[in-house]
């Protein structure tokens, strides 16, 4: 499947295929066509396509990722995942050690890919080690993405954590509601 990292196919065939409307073969092909086209248009030079490289800010990709979900995920994406004024972009611009790798944005994309279809499941979310697996390119330090994950978990409105598991929900966290 090179250059597509196996973690993408694991997420699509394990998590996304549980959605009623998501057709395993057609859904995967449609999504990956949109993802590859978006990366090609942007001139992406990464050696692998990881969950972190899925350009959720691209309207075509976003449409493929939200069309199968029952709830309205667009506000979540715009605020906490990959919008032009999103928290990950803000953190990446404020913190050069994270911004050099777009670490917060890559963490947010990976969590979305691994958690959006499983919000109704008993075991929600994606483990922190799978987040790093979906983000880190050869030669990069996993610790940078661990730092980005911690910062995202403490500041994001729709990001939940239970032990090593992280997931997005369409409902804001109680902590963020209390702060607002």
Where are these regions (language model features)?
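C-terminal helical "lid" subdomain and adjoining coupling/linker elements of P-loop NTPases
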Residues: 1-109, 117-126, 133-144, 154-167, ...
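Short, hydrophobic-biased segments on the C-terminal half of alpha helices
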Residues: 146-150
């Amino acid at each position: 499947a090179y250059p597509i990292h196996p973690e993408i196919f694991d997420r699509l065939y394990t998590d996304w295929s549980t959605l009623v409307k998501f057709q395993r073969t057609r859904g995967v092909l449609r999504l990956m066509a949109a993802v590859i086209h978006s990366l090609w248009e942007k001139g992406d030079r990464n050696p692998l396509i990881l969950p972190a490289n899925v350009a959720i800010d691209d309207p075509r990709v976003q449409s493929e990722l939200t069309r199968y979900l029952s709830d309205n995920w667009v506000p979540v994406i715009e605020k906490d995942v990959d919008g032009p004024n999103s928290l990950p972009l803000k953190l990446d611009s404020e913190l050069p050690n994270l911004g050099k790798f777009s670490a917060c944005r890559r963490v947010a994309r990976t969590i979305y890919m691994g958690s959006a279809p499983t919000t109704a499941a008993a075991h929600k979310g994606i483990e922190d080690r799978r987040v790093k697996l979906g983000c880190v390119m050869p030669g990069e330090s996993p610790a940078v993405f661990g730092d980005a994950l911690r910062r995202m978990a403490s500041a994001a409105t729709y990001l939940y954590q239970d032990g090593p598991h992280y997931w997005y929900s369409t409902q804001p966290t109680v902590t963020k509601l209390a702060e607002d």
